Amino acid sequence: MIHSNLIPNAQFNDSYDLENLDDLEIASMEQSHSDVSLEVDTPGTYKTDGLITKKKKLALVVKTADCMPVIIADENKIGIIHIGWKGLENKIFHKTILNFN
């Protein structure tokens, strides 16, 4: 459950509606405003602020409020990055691009 201090008494379920997505696996992040990105090929929740995968049917999930979600891709890989001011200051975008290549 996610609570908002911007909208009084608001509650949002932390879940994914995957009813129509057969055979889809999910990799999500326990985001901590770090400069860490990981390449993954299995579903799960990873302590990172960037995910990269070559695996088809592995959905990468990023959650944002006032941070910036970034998607990167080429013919073989896809990646997502959660960038807040701290991650930006610690060069997570640059480090994830290096990890991506």
Predicted features by range, described:
Residues 1-101:
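Active-site microenvironment for binding and transforming phosphate-containing groups
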